[in-house]
Amino acid sequence: MSHNTKGQKIRLAKAHNQNQRVPTWVIIKTNRKVVSHPKRRHWRRNSLDVK
């Protein structure tokens, strides 16, 4: 992937943004009911279907 198109970069950026952990304030606000992120993606285990 040497040359990414603009659309591809935008989709990669979105995937990167979605892959962040649950914010601390959410954990505190929900009294630790929401701690994990079920859609979290590991770069080596799961592949991205970016076109």
UniProtKB/Swiss-Prot annotation:
Record SUPFAM superfamilies: Ribosomal protein L39e (SSF48662)
Keyword DNA repair: no
Single GO MF descriptor: structural constituent of ribosome
Gene Ontology CC entries for this record: ribonucleoprotein complex; ribosome
Coiled coil: none
Sorted UniProt keywords: Ribonucleoprotein, Ribosomal protein
PROSITE patterns the record matches: RIBOSOMAL_L39E
Protein's GO biological process: translation
Family per record: Belongs to the eukaryotic ribosomal protein eL39 family.
HAMAP family for this protein: Ribosomal_eL39
Identification of the protein by name: Large ribosomal subunit protein eL39
Organism: Methanococcoides burtonii (strain DSM 6242 / NBRC 107633 / OCM 468 / ACE-M)
